[in-house]
């Protein structure tokens, strides 16, 4: 069974990484799909985010990382995944993610969305929050993989 885990991952957090590891155990093959959203200016270019994720998952054998543009259901179909993984931190995430899941189902009835609650150790994490803490010099080593921490510190030193 193959599951698609889509997101912008700008940057990858330990919460994302935890979901990837748990999904590998539950579903086998996991495709991490990094969205290139041309309407937003990301902190890290797509190529850097792909490197960050590949570095963080190098110890995992059933994970692949790709980039995509457009509809997530089209990406899932392209990689032959009939499941889409979404992480839930709070009830507010559920309301938003459920709308997206219903939209995806209306576009492709063969694809199901699976929700996994985040590990309580990471339930407060978001990429936006991590960037905010890093911007003001706060400690983020418990929030992101080591390489992402280095990249964020370097980014905010320059900007």
UniProtKB/Swiss-Prot annotation:
Q: Which residues bind ATP?
A: 8-9, 16, 87-89, 97, 122-128
Catalytic activity from the UniProt record: (R)-4'-phosphopantetheine + ATP + H(+) = 3'-dephospho-CoA + diphosphate
UniProt keyword annotations, A-Z: ATP-binding, Coenzyme A biosynthesis, Cytoplasm, Magnesium, Nucleotide-binding, Nucleotidyltransferase, Transferase
The pathway that the record names for this protein is: Cofactor biosynthesis; coenzyme A biosynthesis; CoA from (R)-pantothenate: step 4/5
Listed under GO cellular component are: cytoplasm
Q: What is its EC number?
A: 2.7.7.3
Entry-linked SUPFAM superfamilies: Nucleotidylyl transferase
Q: Main site of residence?
A: cytoplasm
GO biological process terms, alphabetically, are:
coenzyme A biosynthetic process
Positions marked as site (Transition state stabilizer) = 16
- What S-S linkages are listed for this chain? none
Q: Which InterPro entries match?
A: Cyt_trans-like, PPAT, Rossmann-like_a/b/a_fold
Is Coiled coil found in the keyword set? no
* Single GO MF descriptor: pantetheine-phosphate adenylyltransferase activity
The protein's location, in the record's own words, is: Cytoplasm
Repeat: present as a keyword of the record? Answer: no
EC supergroup of this enzyme: transferase
Q: Where does substrate bind?
A: 8, 40, 72, 86
Q: How does it assemble?
A: Homohexamer.
The UniProt entry's sequence similarity note says: Belongs to the bacterial CoaD family.
In terms of PANTHER family, this protein maps to: PHOSPHOPANTETHEINE ADENYLYLTRANSFERASE
HAMAP family reported for this sequence = PPAT_bact
Q: What is this protein's name?
A: Phosphopantetheine adenylyltransferase
- The protein's organism comes out as Prochlorococcus marinus (strain MIT 9515)
């Amino acid at each position: 069974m193959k599951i698609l885990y889509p997101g912008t991952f700008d940057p990858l957090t330990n919460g994302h990484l935890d979901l990837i590891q748990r999904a590998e155990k539950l579903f086998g093959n996991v495709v991490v799909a990094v969205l290139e959203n041309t309407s937003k200016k990301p902190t890290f270019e797509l190529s850097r985010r792909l490197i960050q994720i590949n570095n963080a998952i190098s110890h995992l054998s059933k994970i692949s990382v790709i980039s995509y543009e457009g509809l997530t259901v089209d990406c899932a179909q392209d990689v032959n995944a009939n499941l889409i993984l979404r992480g839930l931190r709070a009830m507010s995430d559920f309301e938003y993610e459920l709308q997206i899941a219903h939209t995806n189902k209306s576009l492709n009835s063969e694809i199901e969305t699976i929700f996994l609650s985040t590990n309580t150790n990471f339930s407060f994490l978001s990429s936006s929050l991590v960037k905010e803490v890093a911007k003001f010099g706060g400690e983020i080593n418990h929030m992101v993989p080591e390489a992402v921490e280095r990249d964020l510190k370097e980014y905010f030193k320059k900007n």
